[in-house]
Amino acid sequence: GRGIKKGNPKTTYIAYGAETRKSMLADDSEKLLNWYKEKGVTPKEYYLVVGRFVPENNYETMIREFMCSKTTKNFVIITNVNDKFLDELETRLHFKKDSRIRFVGTVYDQELLKKIRENAYGYFHGHEVGGTNPSLLEALGSTDLNLLLDVPFNREVALDSALYWTKKSGSLARLIETADKMSGSEIEAYGAKAKERITKAYSWEFISSEYRKVFLGK
C-alpha cells in the first residue's frame, strides 16, 4: 500500500527449500509395492502430479492433453479431490473413459511420496499463479524428467533443467510423446541438472545460509 511505498523498506527475498536426498524406502519395500498394487501402476510407467485440486493448477489442460497423446503410460494424480470440480472435469473431458487417468487420493507418508516421485517417468507442473511452488522444488529434487507450464516463475526456478509446455492445444500432448522417446541417458541428464539447480539455489543448507546473512550478517 501507500504506506509501504512511502517508507521504502529494505526487502530481501529468500525462497523455499527442498531436498535432493533419496527416499529411505527401498524399491522392494512392502509399503511401496502394496501402494503400486492397490493403484494399479508400475514404476517408471507413469507421469505424476502432486498438488491442490484447483482450476488454476490447470488440471483440465493436463488431462485433456494427456488424453490426446499416444502414450501408453498412466497419469497418476495425487490430490485431495474436490467432487464438484471433478464432476465439472468429467462433464467437459469424459476422462473416466480413459483408463490411463488415475486419481489415487492423497499420500501423507513423506518417504512413500518421495519414492513415488523418484519412480515417476515424468512429472507435470501446471501451476501458473503464486510464484515459486514447493511441489515444483520437490519434483526437481526427486523426479528426473519434469514437464512444466511455461510461465516466468517456473522458468526462473528450473532454468534449463526441465521441458516446457504451453496451454495451446497440442503443446503438452506433443511434449509427452517427445518425452516418451527420450533415452535413459537423456532423462538422467535432465535429472542431474534439476538436482544441481536445487542444490545450488534451493537446498536447505543454502536457504539457511541466506537467513544467516539477513539476521546475523554472516
Q: For the regions a protein language model found, what residue spans apply to each?
A:
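Conserved acidic donor-binding segment of nucleotide-sugar-dependent glycosyltransferases
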Residues: 162-170, 178-184
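A charged, aromatic-enriched C-terminal amphipathic alpha-helix characteristic of glycosyltransferases
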Residues: 185-216
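Short donor-sugar binding/catalytic loops of nucleotide-sugar-dependent glycosyltransferases
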Residues: 17, 50-54, 80-82, 107
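Conserved donor-binding/catalytic core segment of Leloir-type glycosyltransferases
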Residues: 36, 40-57, 63-70, 76
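Nucleotide-activated donor-binding/catalytic signature segment of Leloir-type glycosyltransferases, i.e.
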Residues: 88-111
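Short alpha-helical segment that forms part of, or immediately flanks, the ligand-binding pocket
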Residues: 114, 136-141, 152-156
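Acidic donor-binding loop of glycosyltransferase active sites
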Residues: 115-131, 144-145
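Donor nucleotide-sugar binding/catalytic pocket of nucleotide-sugar-dependent glycosyltransferases
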Residues: 1-34, 41-42
